Amino acid sequence: MSTDKANSWVYCEDFVEEDDVLLRARERAAQLGCAPVLPGAGAALSVLAAAVGARAAVEIGTGAGVGSLYLLRGMPDDGVLTTIDIEVEHQRAAKEAFAERGVRSTRTRTISGRALDVLPRLTDGAYDLVFVDADTESYPGYVEQAVRLLRPGGVLAVDDALWHDRVPDPARRDETTTVIREVGRTVRDHEQLLPALLPAGDGLLVAVRR
């Protein structure tokens, strides 16, 4: 990456300043060992949620609630975020972030469990936005479920879509990079999705459900 390009990326990441609530959520994420969405991708999530007026959203991978806060920022006041994580400690940290933000309890539904067990129980076509930010090996299954869950006009967002800049390099063939690269191709070629790959954060793959 050229110096100018790197500087532009840093500028974009810092363009929307994070407040103290988000910064504390990031600190808790670091303590728990989970990697939250980066600021540029988070800001993009807020914009996407606002653009589609997301009253019902699903987050796969709660972490410490950083991505959740960005989604809730863009959702209308009556919007409900369903967020799924297998780690109870993660959800406890996220609830702390929600309380600090003053988010009403009726605006979030936290579900503890394996996302691939939980997602099939959610209603077809009932969601405006699905955000994937969990174990990368399960990304193919998450994307398949997301397409089912989204209403026409709903938005899919997949974090870490460039995976430390490894995805664009065909010589990189480790398991994680290969899975994410294939997910990108699946979304790109899916007849029901209109996709774009944004260089925000560590790459944000987005698509609109036709």
PLM regions and their residue ranges:
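A short alpha-helical cap/connector motif
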Residues: 1-129, 136-157, 161-210
